């Protein structure tokens, strides 16, 4: 990439991460507004006037494909390895301990930490308006997935105020927490990508077999599900979401080859499989089957959750 404009910075390093692979001894010209003006090589950066050298690997800005920025205040507040159902239950117990000011401060700190770590774009999940002010003035580019959640919620009307914010779109939380009519309505609405929690725990597949911790939790709480006849989360996904809708499936810890075959046999639009390994280790100790995804040559992205 070359340009007639003069760079305000020249940055050299040992390696540069490019779409074509690693480039040795790179020299990158950067404009004052952050645009990349040129990419070349400089084996001896000491002999290149005005050049900054950083040992290591230069990389483009990173994308955090799945984040719950508004929940940043919960960092360290919930015990490790309590399982998904335990984690969800603990959230409702501890969230009232934090003031609105503490929540906003945690959002600001998390936003700053992501920028410092090289993240320049985030797919953020929102159930409320806590984080929007911070996102509006952040240097990070955010797309906010306004999340529809709840087995007793029949429509997304209560989420309309959140959808008035810039760069937002509606998405269902998961295939186990939304009844059939709202899931189908959301999937048929617009053309923005959907970001769906998928196979984070064994309980998701077990629910469709009328067993497991989610089934027991729902039974105890008096929840009924009108979607268990699909047989599995993957089969429900392809039955309810049009084939040409872009989808990001988040977590994927418990997917099987059959799940992959069902999903990829349906969608003609891109499907991204988003892994959040640190979150999974903290909550359940599970890890996604990375080699299975790689063997199938699937699109993999990363999130912090």
Over which residues does each language-model region extend?
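Active-site beta-loop-alpha junctions enriched in small/polar residues
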Residues: 68, 127-128, 145-151, 173-175, ...
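Active-site gating loops and adjacent loop-to-helix segments of metal-dependent hydrolytic enzymes
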Residues: 71-105, 143-146, 201-245, 266-270
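Active-site gating/metal-coordination segments in enzymes
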Residues: 120, 159-193
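Alpha-helical scaffold segments that flank or form the walls of functional sites
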Residues: 57-58, 73-137, 159-165
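Active-site-adjacent C-terminal substructures of enzyme catalytic domains
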Residues: 173-184, 224-305
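Hydrophobic faces of well-ordered beta-strands that scaffold small-molecule active sites
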Residues: 61-67, 122-124, 142-146, 168-172, ...
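N-terminal metal-binding scaffold of metallo-dependent hydrolase/deaminase domains
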Residues: 1-46
